[in-house]
């Protein structure tokens, strides 16, 4: 009968147990557990989270094993608000310490989804009856652009949005607009009405003299071909101006 092999005991390896006891335990990084707690706080009360905490959560996907709080705060310090962080140029986001191209891409993806979501609320709908949604969409799309954009919303005879196009992109304070090209594009799309929209990167939506004069030229050019200009809306960072509401059309 084979003799059972004895299992070595502590006495056979002097000092072995002492070595185990002296081996320091690996400490978890200080942010371990913080991610789970922050996720749970979001589930319980998303509106209670600070802006930097929402950005932290967003960065979890792009940054797997690091504390995202300093990066989130640095982004807000650099650009101002969540909306301005998302609208910031990709190369400037990547310059933030700890961010890099992966974080920049993640944020631009979220911005694109937000714009697409806002746009879906106005496409193929009666625009004049959904004016707040139109303004919300234009604000999401243009308010934090660093250069002026001239956008046209083309409508059919039922005032449903059939196309939304950026016709021109200019400088920080000027966008060239050509009434003939605007009217030509409306005819190509069989649009019977249009809404003009452009942004002021300065943040102040007050129409300039040039804005007013250009609008009048466009109204006259469109009227000659039975195309109605419903409004010209100027988008700022914290508000908008309607030339029709101001009785400038």
From Swiss-Prot:
Residue stretches making up the MPN domain: 127-249
Keywords: Hydrolase, Metal-binding, Metalloprotease, Protease, Zinc
UniProt xrefs under Pfam families: RadC (PF04002)
PROSITE patterns in the record: MPN (PS50249), UPF0758 (PS01302)
Cysteines paired by S-S bonds: none
The protein's name: UPF0758 protein BCAN_A1306
NCBIfam families xrefs: PRK00024.1, radc
SUPFAM superfamilies membership: JAB1/MPN domain (SSF102712), RuvA domain 2-like (SSF47781)
Source organism of the structure: Brucella canis (strain ATCC 23365 / NCTC 10854 / RM-666)
Chain residue ranges for the region called Disordered: 1-34
Residues reported to bind Zn(2+): 198, 200, 211
Any Gene Ontology biological process: proteolysis
Domain of life according to the entry: Bacteria
Gene Ontology MF terms: metal ion binding; metallopeptidase activity
Compositionally biased region (Basic and acidic residues): 24-34
Similarity annotation: Belongs to the UPF0758 family.
InterPro entries in UniProt: MPN, RadC_JAB, RuvA_2-like, UPF0758, UPF0758_CS
Claim: Protease is one of the keywords in the record: yes
Motif range (JAMM motif): 198-211
């Amino acid at each position: 009968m084979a003799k059972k092999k004895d299992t070595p005991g502590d006495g056979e390896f002097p000092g072995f147990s002492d070595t185990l006891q002296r081996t320091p335990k690996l400490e978890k990084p200080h942010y371990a557990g913080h991610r789970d707690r922050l996720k749970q706080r979001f589930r319980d009360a998303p509106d209670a989270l600070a802006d930097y905490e929402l950005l932290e959560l967003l960065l979890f996907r792009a940054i797997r094993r690091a504390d995202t709080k300093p990066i989130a705060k640095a982004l807000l310090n650099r650009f101002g608000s969540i909306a301005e962080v998302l609208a910031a140029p990709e190369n400037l986001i990547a310059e933030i310490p700890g961010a890099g191209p992966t974080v920049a891409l993640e944020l631009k993806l979220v911005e694109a989804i937000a714009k697409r979501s806002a746009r879906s609320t106005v496409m193929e709908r009666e625009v004049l009856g959904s004016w707040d949604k139109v303004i919300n969409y234009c604000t999401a799309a243009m308010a934090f652009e660093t250069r002026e954009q001239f956008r046209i919303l083309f409508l059919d005879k039922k005032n449903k949005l059939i196309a939304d196009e950026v016709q021109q992109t200019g400088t920080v304070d000027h966008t060239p607009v050509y009434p003939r090209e605007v009217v030509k594009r409306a005819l190509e799309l069989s649009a019977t009405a249009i809404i003009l929209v452009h942004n002021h990167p300065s943040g102040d939506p007050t129409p300039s003299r040039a804005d007013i004069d250009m609008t009048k030229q466009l109204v006259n050019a469109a009227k000659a071909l039975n195309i109605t200009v419903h409004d010209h809306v100027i988008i700022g960072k914290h508000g908008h101006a309607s030339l029709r509401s101001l009785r400038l059309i």
